[in-house]
Swiss-Prot record:
This is Regulator of G-protein signaling 14. Residues 67-184 form the RGS domain. Interacts with GNAI1, GNAI2 and GNAI3. Interacts with GNAO1. Interacts (via RGS and GoLoco domains) with GNAI1; the interaction occurs in the centrosomes. Interaction with GNAI1 or GNAI3 (via active GTP- or inactive GDP-bound forms) prevents association of RGS14 with centrosomes or nuclear localization. Interacts with RABGEF1; the interactions is GTP-dependent. Interacts with RAP2A; the interactions is GTP-dependent and does not alter its function on G(i) alpha subunits either as GAP or as GDI. Associates with microtubules. Found in a complex with at least BRAF, HRAS, MAP2K1, MAPK3 and RGS14. Changing L518Y: Increases the interaction with GNAI1. One of its GO terms (cellular component) is dendrite. Regulates G protein-coupled receptor signaling cascades. Inhibits signal transduction by increasing the GTPase activity of G protein alpha subunits, thereby driving them into their inactive GDP-bound form. Besides, modulates signal transduction via G protein alpha subunits by functioning as a GDP-dissociation inhibitor (GDI). Has GDI activity on G(i) alpha subunits GNAI1 and GNAI3, but not on GNAI2 and G(o)-alpha subunit GNAO1. Has GAP activity on GNAI0, GNAI2 and GNAI3. May act as a scaffold integrating G protein and Ras/Raf MAPkinase signaling pathways. Pfam families: GoLoco, RBD, RGS. Residues 497-519 form the GoLoco domain. SUPFAM superfamilies: Regulator of G-protein signaling, RGS, Ubiquitin-like.
Length: 544
């Protein structure tokens, strides 16, 4: 006789969202002892991840979703993860990681075995002709010469990159894959897990058997027969697990920030975050619980890459600006929001406007770039400007735009701090003067050259007129040459330059006199047609 329909949901606390918050930590002193054995990535030194109210012996499959490190510590979980990577044609990543783990356990004194294993790992995964090459950055490439002096930790950097790639990219897809959902369902029903690579979970009869229900009965909400769902529709099965979690557990788990450094080829799966948000919202609507729905409804998230290389998740809540959304993250990380530029990943040409609504960044990735600001006091112009530049720029590069605006060059100015005579080297990085005030002085010869420079249009317009009035110009003396004819001294003659300036001013004045004539007080007489009748010459007052 069929009994009541069995609820297949996992009890509260047994399902943790697949957002790992484990942190790659260095090995402690006790772990690093003993002939260079062990590594910060050793499976014995991996962080345990978030604690669970249920032991891993009771619920081993559910514990796989708590952290990537806990998955690697379970041999069966590692086997299922390897099978998943085979379907994605990236099983060489976990194979390389396991090979590095075994390599680090070789004593440093056993140079023969180290050399043999290092040769095998290099030619199988890292060389240009490798049979199963792994995806690592150019900075982590190794040449074959390093095999001459093998060390237990010689592949640590490459192993770290592959570890981050699996943790932040492959692991997020594994915990929401149909393969993992089948394992969760089998564990919830008490069925034994199938061996990785086989076609069915447990007994084929139990795996394919459709639940028989009494008339008028139905399966619990969110639970359907897995075999009848297409591949893309297999995900709603997770809705039954999330339904029984406390209301704040979903939000708190989603707010966890990843503490490990991100590899350039690894990224957080934002599609999974959007799926969690949409499924949670639709599930609450189906339950018909209207109380507090607007307050507890989770929104979509934005992945924020920080300047130090780490990543964080920000809730794109409607009604908030991008500035408000990032204020909490910047305050927590000790960043000054006015000194931050925000760029969309892949579109770094133009920074985002922080006053627009943050919902435009839902399911998007943004990158924060820090800017160094300092105050620059222009003595000659009596102005104070605020300059913002990248930390990697030098002072001469940051000052170039303001100097070009005022027609100056780097050899015409000096930079120093207020009240100090010691000059600031323009080759220093901008980060060395962060939040400081600098004074920009111009050299005396720079001021002279700026005052003596005459626009070509003015000089060309007045020179032809002065050719007809040579009597007004004093003869040019031989002392007006800027440099000596022999070129031995090469020094500028300041007095001759001043004489040239006075001469050019007189040339301009002569040109104006030739055109308009000298304006005197006697010449300022109104024409007759503009004068009043009483002011006209020869006019008489009419008799009364």
């Amino acid at each position: 006789m069929p009994g009541k329909p069995k609820h297949l949901g996992v009890p509260n606390g047994r399902m943790v969202l697949a957002v790992s918050d484990g942190e790659l930590t260095s090995t402690s002193g006790s772990q690093a002892q003993g002939e260079g054995r062990g590594s910060s990535l050793s499976i014995h030194s991996l962080p345990s991840g978030p604690s669970s109210p249920f032991s891993t012996d009771e619920q081993p499959v559910a514990s796989w979703a708590q952290s990537f490190e806990r998955l690697l510590q379970d041999p069966r979980g590692l086997a299922y993860f390897t099978e998943f990577l085979k379907k994605e044609f990236s099983a060489e990543n976990v194979t390389f990681w396991q090979a590095c783990e075994r390599f680090q356990q070789i004593p440093a004194s056993d140079t023969k075995q180290l050399a043999q294993e290092a040769h095998n790992i290099y030619h199988e995964f890292l060389s240009s002709q490798a049979l199963s090459p792994v995806n690592i950055d150019r900075q982590a490439w190794l040449s074959e010469e390093v095999l001459a002096q093998p060390r237990p930790d010689m592949f640590r950097a490459q192993q770290l990159q592959i570890f981050n790639l699996m943790k932040f990219d492959s692991y997020a897809r594994f915990v929401k894959s149909p393969l993992y959902q089948e394992c969760l369902l089998a564990e919830a029903e008490g069925r034994p897990l199938r061996e990785p690579g086989s076609s069915h979970l447990g007994s084929p009869d139990t795996a394919r058997k459709k639940p028989k229900l009494k008339p008028g009965k139905s399966l619990p909400l969110g639970v359907e027969e897995l075999g009848q769902l297409p591949l893309a529709e297999g995900r709603p099965l997770r809705k039954s697990f999330r339904r029984e979690m406390p209301g704040g557990a979903v939000n708190s788990a989603l707010r966890r920030e990843s503490q490990g450094s991100l590899n350039s080829s690894a990224s957080l799966d934002l599609g999974f975050l959007a799926f969690v948000s949409s499924k949670s919202e639709s599930h609450r609507k189906s339950l018909g619980s209207g109380e507090g729905e607007s307050e507890s409804r989770p929104g979509k998230y934005c992945c924020v890459y920080l300047p130090d290389g780490t990543a964080s998740l920000a809730l794109a809540r409607p009604g908030l600006t991008i500035r408000d959304m990032l204020a909490g993250i910047c305050e927590k990380r000790g960043l000054s929001l006015p000194d931050i530029k925000v760029y969309l990943v892949g579109k770094e040409q133009k920074a985002l406007v922080l006053d627009q609504d943050c919902t435009v960044l839902a399911d998007q990735e943004v990158r924060l770039e820090n800017r160094i600001t300092f105050q620059l006091e222009l003595v000659g112009l009596e102005r104070v400007v605020r300059i913002s530049a990248k930390p990697t720029k030098r002072l001469q590069e940051a000052l170039q735009p303001i100097l070009a605006k005022h027609g100056l060059s780097l050899d015409q100015v000096v930079l120093h701090r207020p009240g100090e005579k010691q000059l600031v080297d323009l080759e220093n990085l901008v980060s060395s003067v962060a939040s400081q005030t600098l004074v920009l002085d111009t050299l005396p010869d720079a001021k002279t050259r700026e005052a003596s420079s005459i626009p070509p249009c003015r000089s060309q317009g007045c020179l032809p007129r002065t050719q007809t009035k040579d009597s007004h110009l004093p003869p040019l003396s031989s002392s007006l040459s800027v440099e000596d004819a022999s070129g031995s001294t090469g020094k500028r003659q300041t007095c001759d330059i001043e004489g040239l300036v006075e001469l050019l001013n007189r040339v301009q004045s002569s040109g104006a006199h030739d055109q308009r004539g000298l304006l005197r007080k006697e010449d300022l007489v109104l024409p007759e047609f503009l004068q009043l009748p009483s002011q006209r010459p020869g006019s008489q007052e009419a008799p009364p």
